[in-house]
């Protein structure tokens, strides 16, 4: 039912996030917490795919912990549910955001001849050069950049921006946040990103 409500907003895609490791989410069995209940994760995925007429994608992690690295089997099962793409974060839930992302299993999923859907790699990509290296080494179809964009929205630029150009981008980000959220929350949201900015 929730997916049908979301579909009324005419999204291009509905992405199911089974990757959020935050305790208040995962401890309730949501986000990466779903990795401890794969049958339910698959049932939810199948039902959402059946309920909507837009592509459904999934984002998840390698597994719950290093003893439960389930992504190679899970990728096939999710594809069988009818998803159109799979984003894999190269850490387990128990790692949260610590340590280094392990792209080895992401590469294994991509090289699996049974996998026909696009595989999107995620984790520890902080520059276009690192994204290019991930494409080259792991043959992923796309790379998702997350936290590295905080305070650094020019990360996607192919050339180094001057200080004035960076300030201009940050001003534009503030303008957009105020326009699309509201003045108070837009400023607070922008401040959080500015705190992470290397400017």
Task: Name every feature range the model reports, one short phrase each.
Residues 1-79:
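Active-site entrance/lid segments in N-terminal catalytic domains of soluble metabolic enzymes
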Residues 31, 87-102:
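Short secondary-structure boundary segments
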């Amino acid at each position: 039912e929730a997916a049908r409500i979301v579909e009324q907003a005419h999204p291009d895609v509905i992405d199911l996030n089974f990757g959020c490791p935050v305790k208040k989410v995962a401890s309730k069995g949501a986000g990466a917490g779903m990795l401890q209940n794969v049958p339910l994760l698959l049932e939810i995925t199948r039902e959402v795919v059946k309920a909507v007429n837009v592509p459904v994608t999934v984002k998840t992690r390698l597994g719950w912990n290093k003893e439960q690295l389930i992504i190679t089997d899970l990728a096939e099962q999710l594809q069988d549910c009818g998803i159109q793409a799979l984003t894999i974060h190269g850490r387990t839930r128990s790692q949260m955001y610590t340590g280094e992302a392990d792209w080895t299993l992401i590469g294994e999923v991509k090289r699996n001849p049974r996998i026909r859907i696009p595989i999107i790699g995620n984790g520890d990509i902080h520059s276009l050069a690192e994204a290019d290296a991930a494409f080259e080494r792991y043959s992923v179809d796309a790379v998702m950049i997350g936290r590295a964009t905080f305070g650094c929205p020019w990360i996607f630029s192919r050339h180094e921006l001057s200080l004035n150009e960076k300030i201009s981008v940050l001003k534009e980000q503030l303008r957009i946040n105020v326009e699309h959220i509201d003045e108070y929350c837009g400023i607070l949201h922008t401040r959080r990103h500015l705190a992470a900015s290397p400017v």
